[in-house]
Amino acid sequence: MDFILKMKDKSLKNIKLTREEGLRLFNSNLEELIKEANNIRKEIHGDGIDLCSIINGKSGRCGEDCAFCAQSKYHKTNISEYPLLDYEKIKKVAKENEDEGVHRFSIVTSGRGLYGEEFERVITYYSNLNKELKINLCASHGIINKESLIKLKKAGVKRYHHNLETSRNYYDKICKTHSYEERVKTIKNAKEAGLEVCSGGIIGLGETILDRIDLAITLRELEIKSIPINVLSAIKGTKLQNMIPLNEEEILRTIAVFRFINPEAKIRLAGGRYLLKNFGENAFKAGANATITGNLLTTCGNKIKDDKRLIENIGMRIF
């Protein structure tokens, strides 16, 4: 207990925790760990929950070999494959989310990146959405250069999403068609272009607890202010189809430690919420203060109205 309180004090003072301290926290008393992670969240952020939503704007046929992903051409899955959606379809979904009180909306596209005519089309999409709607715009278009990121910002995008997925040490066990450094460079490019950055990862890929802590520390070093935590949904046909799902306690411990290491960030529940009781009710009591709501890329999420009810029932509020 004394150790957890000491770590809480360091976190509130924004003193960086070490990986050894992170590991000790992970293995500490669950009830006290969750309680103090929640107290850090309350003291720094209050009781507001940030909601975001996404649309799978271009699906499948991805040339990268990410072991977890249903959209990779290296995997045989039953997902829908289609090119970039037309503007009216995307606008309709964005407007529905805005009307429901969601704060942010992102177009997500499959592939290493988005190039040429498709990229220019999506720039037009963002520009039009920015003029016609009030919802904050985010973008997720893979590995990208600074020049293209500046174009996104000029079109009205406020935040770029690009996950690191796991630790630097474990990354080549998950993907070999591009490097960890390319992902880090994309994040740095986005920040240099004046964009906010959303970056997190996936837990349950076969990584160690130290890999998760290393990821949390890397995100802290990059000063990421929105950190989505996905829990692997093992999809049939992918390389990780036989991975055993994480149990709720391990997920909650991970969320709590991420809160200690990244006290000023939004810790955002993302994919795999269905593995948690009531789509993550306890996670919001373990330091999380944001969530993706609605459907995800190739899996179903929680309905917006149900998330709003959940948040209200636990005594928190939507920003």
Curated annotation (Swiss-Prot):
UniProt binding sites for [4Fe-4S] cluster: 62, 66, 69
Keyword 4Fe-4S: yes
Lineage: Bacteria, Bacillati, Bacillota, Clostridia, Eubacteriales
Keyword Translocase: no
InterPro entries: Aldolase_TIM (IPR013785), BATS_dom (IPR010722), Biotin_synth/BioAB (IPR002684), Biotin_synthase (IPR024177), Elp3/MiaA/NifB-like_rSAM (IPR006638), rSAM (IPR007197)
Pathway annotation: Cofactor biosynthesis; biotin biosynthesis; biotin from 7,8-diaminononanoate: step 2/2
Catalytic activity: (4R,5S)-dethiobiotin + (sulfur carrier)-SH + 2 reduced [2Fe-2S]-[ferredoxin] + 2 S-adenosyl-L-methionine = (sulfur carrier)-H + biotin + 2 5'-deoxyadenosine + 2 L-methionine + 2 oxidized [2Fe-2S]-[ferredoxin]
UniProt cofactor(s): [4Fe-4S] cluster; [2Fe-2S] cluster
Domain Radical SAM core stretches: 44-273
Binding locations of [2Fe-2S] cluster: 106, 138, 198, 268
Manner of cofactor binding, per the entry note: Binds 1 [4Fe-4S] cluster. The cluster is coordinated with 3 cysteines and an exchangeable S-adenosyl-L-methionine.
Coiled-coil annotated spans: none
Family under the similarity heading: Belongs to the radical SAM superfamily. Biotin synthase family.
Organism of origin: Clostridium perfringens (strain 13 / Type A)
Keywords: 2Fe-2S, 4Fe-4S, Biotin biosynthesis, Iron, Iron-sulfur, Metal-binding, S-adenosyl-L-methionine, Transferase
One of the record's GO molecular function terms: 4 iron, 4 sulfur cluster binding
CDD domains membership: Radical_SAM (cd01335)
Subunit structure: Homodimer.
This enzyme's EC code(s): 2.8.1.6
Protein name (database record): Biotin synthase
GO biological process, one term: biotin biosynthetic process
Job description of the protein: Catalyzes the conversion of dethiobiotin (DTB) to biotin by the insertion of a sulfur atom into dethiobiotin via a radical-based mechanism.
